[in-house]
Amino acid sequence: MGRSLRKGPFVDHSLIKKVRAMNLLEKKAPIKTWSRRSMITPEMIGHTFEVHNGKKFLTVFVSETMVGHKLGEFSPTRMFKSHPVKKG
């Protein structure tokens, strides 16, 4: 079940504040965030985010096709190591 349209997208206040400040200064420095739940909005296009995956920060460059998705979708938290191959 998705979020109600009446509420609008969720974006962490501190994150949107940093993005707007960067837009005013026309700077494109990476923005470090732990807010994986924040939705990507059109004003974030062209910015680079460092999204925490639980262990380290992964770099995510926001493009037009990412709008409407969440930052955490582009920073996987689990690594699958293949099962051992049986010899015989």
Curated annotation (Swiss-Prot):
One of its GO terms (cellular component) is cytoplasm. The keyword RNA-binding applies. Keywords: Ribonucleoprotein, Ribosomal protein, RNA-binding, rRNA-binding. SUPFAM superfamilies: Ribosomal protein S19. Signal peptide: none annotated. One of its GO terms (biological process) is ribosomal small subunit assembly. GO terms for molecular function: rRNA binding; structural constituent of ribosome. PROSITE patterns: RIBOSOMAL_S19 (PS00323). The keyword rRNA-binding applies. It comes from the Bacteria. Gene3D superfamilies: 30s Ribosomal Protein S19, Chain A (3.30.860.10). Belongs to the universal ribosomal protein uS19 family. Protein S19 forms a complex with S13 that binds strongly to the 16S ribosomal RNA. This is Small ribosomal subunit protein uS19. It comes from Chlamydia felis (strain Fe/C-56) (Chlamydophila felis). The lineage of its organism: Bacteria, Pseudomonadati, Chlamydiota, Chlamydiia, Chlamydiales.
